[in-house]
Structure formats: C-alpha cells, structure tokens
Amino acid sequence: MRVGPTGVCNQRGDSALGFNTRICRRDFLNAALLASGNTLLSSLAPSQLLGQQPSWGGYSGVGDYRGANGNTEDVMLGGHAVRDGAFRTRASTAADTGEVYDLVIVGGGISGLAAALFFKDEAKPNQTCLVLENHSIFGGEARRNEFVVDGQRLMAPQGSNWFAIPSSVEQFYERIGVNWREFKYQEWGGPPPAMPLSRSSYHHARQLPSPANFGFYFGANFGRQPGMWLIDPWNHLEHAPLSAQMRSDFARFLTEYNRAPIHKSEAELRRLDSITAEDALIEHCGVSREFIRLFVAPHEAAARGLGPDALSGAWYLRMIGRAGEIERHSFPDGNTGFPRHIVKTLIPEAIAGPHTLEAVCRNRVTFAALDRPENQVRIRLQSTAIGVEHEGEPGKSDFVRVAYTRNGKIYRLRARSVIMAGGGWITKHVVRDLPPTHRDAYDQFHYSAHLVANVALRNWRFLHKLGLSGGRWFEGFGYWTEVRTTATFGSDSKAIGPDSPTVLTLVVPLFYPGLPTAEQGSKGRRELISTSFREYERRIREQMVDMFSSSGFDPRADIAGIILNRWGHAYVNPQPGFMFGKDGKPAPGEVLRKGPFGRIAFAHTDLSGSMGHQMAIQEAQRALTQVLKLLG
C-alpha cells in the first residue's frame, strides 16, 4: 500500500489513535497557514496560498483518480483567482490556438458530458465540440477514491452516490450502455445469519425506519459516558436517553414524514415557498424545532446541503414523501460509472477494453485519447475557463471568445456556441458580458460546503460484534456511516463479511441552523479550508474510538487509509422564494433556463435546485436543444 509521510506525533494519545502507523496519509497545510484560522479565505489571496507545502488535499488514493480528491488545491486557487478578477487584464495576452468549434462546453461533470453526447447524437458529422474541464479527470462530483487494502482493490464515491429505478432518464442509461438489470451485488460471506447491507453509502441511514441492523449512538451530550448504542432504534425508542417529548417527536416524524401530499395547488406551493422548510415541517408533522435541528437537519443536510431552517418549504415538501416503490443501485464507485460510460460512448478508445460494466469500471482511462484532433468531441482536462464573451453585441454575434488556463499558460479559441455546464458560483464570474437580469438571478443562488471522508478498513468485525452494519450519532464528527455491499463487476471479492476489507464513507455536511442561508455556506467553506488534514484525521479516529473501542475497534490495526474530499460548493440551497421568485422577481432558475443569452446557454444542475444526476442530464438536453437552433 502506498504510504505518505505521517508528520510528527505531538499530542497525547497520538500513538493510541494510530498516528504513528504506516497508512495512506499526508498533511496538507502548514502551521503558518493554519494560524490564520477562519479568516483564511478573506485574509489571504490565492497567490499567497500558492506554493505552500505540504499538499492541500492529503493522500488521494491510487488509480485514475489519484490527485483528484474533491476540489484540489490547484482547482480551488484557480477558481478563487477567476472570482477575484485576477485574469481580466491578462486575457489579452492569451495565446491563440487557432481553433474554432461549433460548441464549447465549460465543465466536464455529468451535465457537460451529457450535453456533449447529445451534441454528438444530433450534430452534423463535420460539426465539432470541445469540453473544458478544470480537474485532472472528468466527472465533477461523480468521481471515486481507490485504495488497495491487503491486496484487494476498493472503491468508494467522492460524492454522487446512487441512482433509482424507475428514473426519468432511463433511456439515457441505455444510450450509454448502463443496463441496471445486470447489477449483481456481493453475497453474504460472514457467519450466519446473513446481515442485510445497503447498496449505497447511506441508504440505511436515510431509510425511515432503518433496518434492525442499524443503530443510534448516544454519548456525553445525552448523559452517557461511556456512550451507548441503541440497536434497531425505531422499534426501541423507549430505551433512548431522550425526553418524553423528543421520543414522541421521533415517533410522530416517522409516521408523518412520508405522508407529505405530492399534489398541491399552485396557491399552496406559493405560500410554502414563502416560508422555510422547518416551519413547513412543524405544520405538517407537528414536531418541535428542537427535534428538527437534532435529527432532521443533519439527515437532510447530507442530501440537500443545509437543514430545513434554510430551505424553501415548497421545494422541500416537493422532494419528500414521494419515494414509492423504487429500486436503488450504485456502481462500486458511486455514480462515477455514469461519466465513465458517457466518455466511453463519446470516445471508445478513452477507456480500454469492451463497453461492459466491468471493463468501464475497472480498466484505466487512456488520457491521451481524450483530446485528439480527429475526435468529433474532444475533452481537455486541467483547463480552467477564465473568460467567455461574445464577439460584439450578443444578439448579433456569430462567435464567442473563450479563454482558459492550462499548465500556467493562458489560451484563447473561438466557438459558434457555448454551454456553461459548471456551477453557477463560478459561471457568473466567467461569462464576462452577462446581462444584469442574469447576474441578479445568479445572486439568488446559495451554496454550501461538504466533506466526504472515505476510511479504508482491514475489517469491520467491531460493527458486526454489535449486530450492526452502520449507525447514526448526534454529537462529535460526522453523522452516520455504514458498510455497503458493492456491485460485483467492480469488486475483487464476490462475497462480503465482517472479515472483509471495506470502506466506510462519512458524509459530513457543514451547516449551522439558525444562521442565514448564505452565511451558513460561507462559514462552512471557511471551516473546510482552514481545517488541516491532520485535524480531520484526528476527529475521525477519535469519533470511531469513542463509538467502537468497546467492541474491539483498534485504530492502529484496523484503519488502512483515509482520503478526504472537500467540496466548497457541493449543494445549491434553494431558499424561500427559489421556486416562484420573491419581491416581484421571477424564479432565478427560470431566468437562466428560458433561452440562450446570445450564443451562450446554461446547463448546470443547480438551476433546478437539485444536484442529482437526473437533473444534470435533463438540463444538458434542454441547453443542447437551445444551441442547436443557433447552429442550424
């Protein structure tokens, strides 16, 4: 297994926590940087951060996604430089590539790649497309981490995690060669009885009620030292160290959560869009605000960025109570399988081997094949768009100028049309001639930060001994985790048991109930950037020791590696007014969707208020339809 430098153990208990063991680990910010604390973002310009050692991101794994864990240092600094206008006076010095494309797509996540595939399906044979992607590999948040633990290759999602059937985009799955009927999962290989495992990193955590092999952990904040695990909590709430009112709220929420009426009148939706989801939940479920902030807020923040106190009541209630009979699936690496299959469809040579689930998942990317001149669709990695602007008046222009940085140099090219498929937080800084209506719309989009920590384990006997495959907790670091069974086409072993190596994924939303929506996002980003890899590692180890040492967990022996994925703008947070507009203004998403601005269309998934891959694909199809009308 690849090992990085571990630094100096200088706190009491470091040895017991396993800091002096040989695992995958690397600190990312030095002491001088960390001294700036929460003022880091506001007090240091990107140029002051450049060159700081050791690396910002920590250990990043092996394989295609090594060096691409979350928003890396280079990507983060490049984005901040664009935001701060660092390239505005330098664009004139850009080297002209001489290239002219019919379509340039800014952003190589699922939205951008889907738009490229729709283009290839609809365009004339001589029409060309270029995708600019600022990371070292395509996929956006649908990327993976890879470990090798005791000879076994393990994969885990960096962000985007699972998909459901039926789906509004099933035809797209078929187009890219993803047959969900072929998904087979690891069978139980441990002692009887077989323990049911989730197919994703958090399905049991979000399932209401969760299965019997899921638990709640209560620690010092609940008067429990040592803490206690409550197994199968939904059926044993009377044993929870909670007040009678709180236990009643748990039971009431379980009953009412999935009874949210799907069909509401427009008048009722407009009313709900004027209040927070927290107030709407109090109306709908009759639970206390205290209960919502203890249990519902982290439950929802992991899926929607922030808790109900910051979200639109109409948008939120539209998203719950509609699960119905769905079948959940996950690639071994989360939804990383979707961008890999799209790229394999666009450029067959880009991933070695046949177009099968196993080959596309396990074979390496041929990076040299992505940007070949003979490709109708080219993908150019490590290329950050810094300026997109029409040549002349937008309504009369025939071309758009596109400037980007790559390997420290600035380049420019021309396009007959552009689709902005990156996030709205950066799009509003990249499109130079954006009109006031669109800028005002973008100002109504708010985003929150997220941390996804993948912890590779040599075994998970400590969980099985408790009768658990996963659990939730209500204090300390993170909120839940669980063992999952992975699709066999991507795993080295066809069976899983407590002796098997596995990866626990900790989804850690950064939210602060009670603060304004925008302020919560800013505060979360400050925390994400100003906390060192070593400090996050310490919190992970301490949390796991607190919860599992009584059942045999030993961080020195059991943890094989840790990778952090930091996402500064992981989720859009639809605040009250997002669905129908506010103060006489139209809904911000509709302003950007209604048609192209000149020769520029907008396709990022946050326009819908939901960061799911289905919406990414649908937004891409809409935007591509708009630009095809321009191309004729």
What are these model-predicted stretches?
Residues 1-27:
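N-terminal secretory signal peptides
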Residues 24-41:
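N-terminal export leaders
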Residues 52-92, 456, 462-632:
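Conserved flavin/dinucleotide-binding core of flavoenzymes
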Residues 58-63, 136-168, 187, 264-265, ...:
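Glycine-rich active-site loop/strand segments that organize a redox cofactor
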Residues 77, 87-259:
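N-terminal glycine-rich phosphate/pyrophosphate-binding loop and immediately adjacent elements
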Residues 248-383, 391-397, 583:
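Active-site/ligand-binding neighborhood in enzyme catalytic cores
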Residues 377, 381-505, 509-514:
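Mid-domain catalytic core of redox enzymes
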